[in-house]
UniProtKB/Swiss-Prot annotation:
Cofactor(s) this protein requires: Mg(2+); Mn(2+)
Any GO MF annotation of the entry: ATP binding
Binding site for Mg(2+) 2: E260, N262
Claim: 4Fe-4S is one of the keywords in the record: no
UniProt keyword annotations, A-Z: ATP-binding, Ligase, Magnesium, Manganese, Metal-binding, Nucleotide-binding, Protein biosynthesis
Gene Ontology cellular-component annotations: cytoplasm
Ligand binding (Mn(2+) 1): D248, E260
UniProt protein name: Probable alpha-L-glutamate ligase
Family affiliation: Belongs to the RimK family.
Organism field: Vibrio atlanticus (strain LGP32)
InterPro entries: ATP-grasp (IPR011761), ATP-grasp_RimK-type (IPR013651), ATP_grasp_subdomain_1 (IPR013815), RimK (IPR023533), Rimk_N (IPR041107), Rp_bS6_RimK/Lys_biosynth_LsyX (IPR004666)
Positions that bind Mg(2+) 1: D248, E260
């Protein structure tokens, strides 16, 4: 098969692992820089040009779209869809999951466990917003943040008010969420491919830190999921319409709660902590499912 990986940097761990895994299975794998793709829109003749040349027809595309280029990246993925190419994650599913507020609204509609969350453009009383999620300690998140950037733990109501006022002064969109203290700075990353959790790791925040992201110095180890955690991850992926994603779960006193569904999860942490060949399993899924015009919109909203 001829397969394209959309990635800004072919030397990144995830990109290089995917390329190597695909080639080891006998596929031709091309790494394409998303921002160097030009979209040609013509009636009944959609095309993509790359570095001035028309791209060939690919059997499948693996999008690795960074948060900073979501709009353009999903436009490129959508153009591949118009050309009849199988995309492991559809453009609409990537957009859906990348919007933190939208994804939480859709997950809540289907009864997925979530932390109490508030959102307001200009609340009449900031104290009411804080009260509605249970008061301090609480977490304040920028809607556009990634890898733990733009996430603040406010330990008192007064501190929460100050942070919210500061963000609002910058006209930033924020979420206010209850702090799941019993998680003790740990979360679980479930790596979902198709309708299966193929690997899972428990990430522990570093000393004095509450964010467990590996980019922020957290550590990771293999973890065995409960049936409830596994079902939560699979259902969250289905609701987002993603064939490939990382579902981040916290263990709360009320059961598992979903913090995020990541449409472009990194492979390094999950492969090294679990010893599983995740990249190979991704290509196994593609081989079974990639057919011309096989994309069918999954998820709603």
């Amino acid at each position: 098969m001829r397969i394209a990986i959309l990635s800004r940097n072919e030397n990144l761990y995830s990109t290089s692992r995917l390329k190597a895994a695909g080639e080891a299975r006998g596929h031709q794998v091309d790494v394409i820089d998303t921002l160097h793709c030009d979209i040609d829109i013509a009636s009944n003749n959609p095309k993509i040009r790359y570095m001035g040349e028309e791209l060939p027809q690919y059997d499948a595309v693996i999008p690795r779209i960074g948060a900073s280029i979501t709009f353009y990246g999903t436009a490129v993925v959508r153009q591949f869809e118009m050309m009849g190419t199988f995309c492991i994650n559809e453009s609409v599913a990537i957009s859906r999951s990348r919007d933190k507020l939208r994804s939480l609204q859709l997950l809540s509609r289907k009864g997925i466990g979530l932390p109490k969350t508030g959102f307001a453009s200009r609340p009449d009383k900031i104290q009411d917003l804080i009260k509605n999620v249970g008061g301090a300690p609480l977490v304040i998140k920028l809607l556009e943040g990634t890898q733990g950037i733009g996430v603040v733990l406010a330990e008192t109501n007064k501190a929460a008010e100050s942070v919210i006022e500061a963000f609002m002064g910058l006209k930033a969109n924020i979420l206010v969420q209850e702090f799941i203290e019993e998680a003790n700075g740990a979360d679980i990353r479930c790596f979902v491919v198709g309708n299966k959790v193929i690997a899972a790791m428990k990430r522990q925040a570093g000393e004095g830190e509450f964010r467990s992201n590996l980019h922020r110095g957290g550590t990771a180890q293999l973890v065995k999921l409960t049936k409830e955690e596994r079902a939560t991850a699979i259902n969250a992926a289905k609701i987002m319409g993603l064939n490939l994603c990382g579902v981040d779960i916290l263990q709360s006193k009320n059961g598992p709660v979903v913090m995020e569904v990541n449409s472009s999860p990194g492979l390094e942490g999950i492969e090294k902590s679990t010893g599983k060949d995740v990249a190979d399993m991704i290509f196994e899924f593609i081989e079974k499912n990639a057919k011309p015009n096989a994309n069918r919109t999954r998820g709603k909203g």
